[in-house]
Amino acid sequence: MAELEAKKVEIVDPAPPAPGPVEAPKEVVADEKAIVAPALPPPAEEKEKPDDSKALVVVETKAPEPADEKKEGSIDRDAVLARVATEKRVSLIKAWEESEKSKAENKAQKKVSAIGAWENSKKANLEAELKKMEEQLEKKKAEYTEKMKNKIALLHKEAEEKRAMIEAKRGEDLLKAEELAAKYRATGTAPKKILGIF
């Protein structure tokens, strides 16, 4: 945090002095031009080198600015220092605000991602449980189907056995009836029970 403040202070410090000196040099430039004009070489030399004189004026306007600031005294310096202190405080507040916002955003994002992970894990557990139940149901269904098929097979077997017994009894009854009929024919007697209808 201290490093960020120091960096921001360094960035802010160069910017504020620029607006202050910009206002002062306009007046100073006029004063310097007035002062510099008599100090110029004779007109003959100016005609020969007009570009050099213009360049000297530009260079001279930049150099005397610190001297004028010293002349103005502690009033401008105090104002500039107060402005720098205010801007420093504002930049520190802004940096703190951005830091707090960033912390809050990161904290919220972390919680949201934690909730997403929790939801995904719970969903995966439920899906695994559902799949397990489906597998158990499929297994039970297969077992039940196998039992039913076995019961059907047993029923079919019993039915076949009963049919076979009925066919065997019918064969025996037919054979017995034929034997009795042959016996009655041979003896010439009539059966005691003729038909149940009569």
Swiss-Prot record:
Subcellular locations according to the entry: Cell membrane
Coiled coil region boundaries: 97-184
Pfam family of the protein (one): Remorin_N
Compositional bias segments (type: Basic and acidic residues): 1-11
Listed InterPro entries: Remorin_C, Remorin_N
Post-translational modifications reported in the UniProt record: The N-terminus is blocked.
Record keyword Ion transport present: no
Keywords: Cell membrane, Coiled coil, Membrane, Phosphoprotein, Transport
UniProt-annotated stretches for the region Disordered: 1-24
Cellular compartments per GO CC: plasma membrane
Topological type in the membrane: Peripheral membrane protein
GO biological process, one term: cell-cell signaling
Protein origin, superkingdom: Eukaryota
Single GO term (MF): galacturonate binding
Membrane-spanning residues: none
Recorded family membership: Belongs to the remorin family.
Job description of the protein: Binds to both simple and complex galacturonides. May be involved in cell-to-cell signaling and molecular transport.
This protein's name: Remorin
Organism: Solanum tuberosum (Potato)
